């Protein structure tokens, strides 16, 4: 049955309108979670996924993070073959095995950490980045092992390590195995320290739980992106526990910098050059 509009609008116009509407690619626009402006995705990507309206740093994938940070040439992924196992046969409302399969399909990653050897403005480095979209960037056995293998490359080649954290903490589905990764990664970083090899921890939004209580806060330099949420327990959990309203901006990177918990805050478009200059000083390779 035709509508009253069909009588007034020629069929050729209606068909052209439908064709035009269907030709707009999906995912061409993205809404800023802070200012709520609708942003053109290609322009947003050119701006390193930072909102041009309010300068909010949007969350990015692990590979996007490493692509922004490392030089384009000479990259080599570390421990890419490692895959997680459901050794405990864990099941809550869903089997852990199924959660892993869903996360792998959604992200294209085998687990929540990507490690790469590459260069920063020509300086050899190893960089690792958490994939928050993979089970909240939670740390399990494979995340811990990839981190340690990245540390081993740094020890072998005597090059710096940079870690971009974005995690909800330890992976509950791996229970004690997950908690062991806190000690494992911390022990690996102690080996770097003993050898005098620099480790810079970059905290991005968000960093919580066992990751914030271990590798994220153990850098020779602890830095963060603007407005990143960083802590151990989340603000809602704390408010429910202490039954008090938290201060404005509590657990944001600016608040932590003011209280001395961070060394500096670096904008995304300044990250490469700022960290290159710092690592040049720490490795005595100032041009």
Curated annotation (Swiss-Prot):
Alphabetical list of SUPFAM superfamilies matching this protein: ClpP/crotonase (SSF52096)
GO molecular function: acetyl-CoA carboxylase activity; ATP binding; carboxyl- or carbamoyltransferase activity; zinc ion binding
Zinc finger (C4-type): 32-54
Main function: Component of the acetyl coenzyme A carboxylase (ACC) complex. Biotin carboxylase (BC) catalyzes the carboxylation of biotin on its carrier protein (BCCP) and then the CO(2) group is transferred by the transcarboxylase to acetyl-CoA to form malonyl-CoA.
InterPro entries per record: AcCoA_carboxyl_beta, Acetyl_CoA_COase_Trfase_b_su, ClpP/crotonase-like_dom_sf, COA_CT_N, Znf-ACC
Nucleotide-binding among keywords: yes
Cofactor: binding details: Binds 1 zinc ion per subunit.
Official protein name in the record: Acetyl-coenzyme A carboxylase carboxyl transferase subunit beta
Needed cofactors: Zn(2+)
Pathway: Lipid metabolism; malonyl-CoA biosynthesis; malonyl-CoA from acetyl-CoA: step 1/1
PROSITE patterns: COA_CT_NTER
Family of this protein: Belongs to the AccD/PCCB family.
Subunit structure and binding partners: Acetyl-CoA carboxylase is a heterohexamer composed of biotin carboxyl carrier protein (AccB), biotin carboxylase (AccC) and two subunits each of ACCase subunit alpha (AccA) and ACCase subunit beta (AccD).
Keyword annotations of the record: ATP-binding, Cytoplasm, Fatty acid biosynthesis, Fatty acid metabolism, Lipid biosynthesis, Lipid metabolism, Metal-binding, Nucleotide-binding, Transferase, Zinc, Zinc-finger
Catalytic reactions of this protein: N(6)-carboxybiotinyl-L-lysyl-[protein] + acetyl-CoA = N(6)-biotinyl-L-lysyl-[protein] + malonyl-CoA
Subcellular localization(s) per the UniProt record: Cytoplasm
Native source organism of the sequence: Marinomonas sp. (strain MWYL1)
Domain CoA carboxyltransferase N-terminal: 28-287
Residues binding Zn(2+), per UniProt: 32, 35, 51, 54
GO biological process annotation, one example: malonyl-CoA biosynthetic process
GO annotations of cellular component type: acetate CoA-transferase complex
EC number(s) per entry: 2.1.3.15
Gene name of this polypeptide: accD
Gene3D superfamilies, per database record: 2-enoyl-CoA Hydratase, Chain A, domain 1
Chief location of this protein within or outside the cell: cytoplasm
């Amino acid at each position: 049955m035709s509508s009253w509009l069909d009588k007034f609008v020629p069929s050729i116009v209606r068909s052209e309108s439908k064709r035009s509407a269907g030709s707009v690619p999906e995912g061409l626009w993205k809404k800023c979670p802070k200012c709520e402006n609708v942003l053109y995705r290609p322009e947003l990507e050119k701006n390193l996924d930072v909102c041009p309206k309010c300068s909010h740093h949007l969350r990015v994938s692990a590979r996007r993070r490493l692509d922004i940070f490392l030089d384009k040439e000479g990259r080599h992924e570390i421990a890419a073959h490692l895959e997680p196992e459901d050794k405990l046969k864990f099941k809550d409302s869903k089997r852990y095995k199924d959660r892993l399969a869903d996360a792998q399909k959604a992200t294209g990653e085998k687990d929540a950490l990507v490690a790469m050897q590459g260069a920063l403005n020509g300086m050899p480095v190893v960089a690792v980045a958490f994939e928050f979209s993979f089970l909240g960037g939670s740390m399990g056995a494979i995340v811990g092992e990839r981190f340690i293998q990245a540390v081993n490359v740094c020890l072998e080649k005597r090059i710096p390590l940079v870690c971009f954290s974005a995690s909800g903490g330890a992976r509950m589905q791996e229970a004690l195995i997950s908690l062991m990764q806190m000690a494992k990664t911390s022990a690996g970083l102690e080996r770097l320290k003993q050898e005098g090899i620099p480790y810079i921890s970059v905290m991005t939004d968000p960093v919580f739980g066992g990751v914030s209580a271990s590798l994220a806060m153990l850098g020779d330099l602890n830095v963060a992106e603007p407005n990143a949420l960083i802590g151990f327990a989340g603000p809602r959990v704390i408010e429910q526990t202490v039954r008090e309203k938290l201060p404005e901006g509590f657990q944001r990177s600016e608040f932590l910098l003011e209280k001395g918990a961070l060394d500096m805050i670096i904008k995304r478009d300044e990250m490469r050059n700022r960290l290159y200059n710092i690592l040049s000083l720490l490795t005595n390779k100032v041009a």
